[in-house]
């Protein structure tokens, strides 16, 4: 690879680091091209699975301000650049790694911090953002309905009491 190509490659990888919400570093030793294609399909449109030379990736990470990943760039390494929801891509990687022992998750990077393998797997075990928001909305709606019922109960009780008193007065007034 010529020096100009290396400079261009480093700039492209650095841009991917900067524009990603998260990255996951994997070892792909022993995976066929067909399996890598299958993995890329499983990741979907929100993630890009890239294979590059470790020295170029290290330089790009440093250029992008990504720290703490240098130890992961040993051996055949690939990086998943996640543009959207990190949970979906992490789930896809974890599932694929379970089914294909040749894929090894080494770690990752999200929100300015390096992630261990365990942390990447914890992200994979989370519900998606939409599901969590729906659960929160459901919990809030239920509690708001209970609160509204509590606030409305005294008013309706007072209204029933006033109606009963009025009826009692009419009954007493009609009896006299």
UniProtKB/Swiss-Prot annotation:
The keyword Transcription regulation does not apply. GO terms for cellular component: large ribosomal subunit. Keywords: Ribonucleoprotein, Ribosomal protein, RNA-binding, rRNA-binding. InterPro entries: Ribosomal_uL10 (IPR001790), Ribosomal_uL10-like_sf (IPR043141), Ribosomal_uL10_bac (IPR022973), Ribosomal_uL10_bac_type (IPR047865), Ribosomal_uL10_CS_bac (IPR002363). The keyword RNA-binding applies. Part of the ribosomal stalk of the 50S ribosomal subunit. The N-terminus interacts with L11 and the large rRNA to form the base of the stalk. The C-terminus forms an elongated spine to which L12 dimers bind in a sequential fashion forming a multimeric L10(L12)X complex. Forms part of the ribosomal stalk, playing a central role in the interaction of the ribosome with GTP-bound translation factors. This is Large ribosomal subunit protein uL10. The gene is rplJ.
């Amino acid at each position: 690879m010529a020096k100009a190509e290396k400079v261009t490659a480093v700039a492209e990888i650095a841009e991917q680091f900067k524009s990603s919400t998260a990255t996951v570093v994997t070892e792909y030793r022993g995976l066929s091209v067909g399996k890598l294609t299958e993995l890329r399909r499983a990741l979907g449109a929100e993630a890009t699975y890239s294979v590059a030379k470790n020295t170029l990736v290290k330089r790009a990470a440093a250029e992008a301000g990504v720290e703490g990943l240098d130890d992961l760039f040993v051996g055949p390494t690939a990086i998943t650049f996640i543009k959207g929801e990190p949970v979906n891509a992490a789930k896809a990687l974890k599932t694929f790694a379970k089914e294909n022992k040749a894929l090894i998750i080494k770690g990752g990077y999200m929100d300015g911090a390096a992630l261990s393998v365990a942390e990447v797997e914890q992200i994979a075990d989370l519900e998606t953002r939409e599901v969590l928001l729906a659960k929160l909305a459901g919990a809030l709606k239920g509690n708001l309905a209970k609160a509204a019922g509590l606030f409305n109960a005294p008013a309706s009780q007072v209204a029933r009491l006033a109606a009963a008193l009025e009826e009692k007065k009419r009954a007493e007034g009609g009896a006299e």
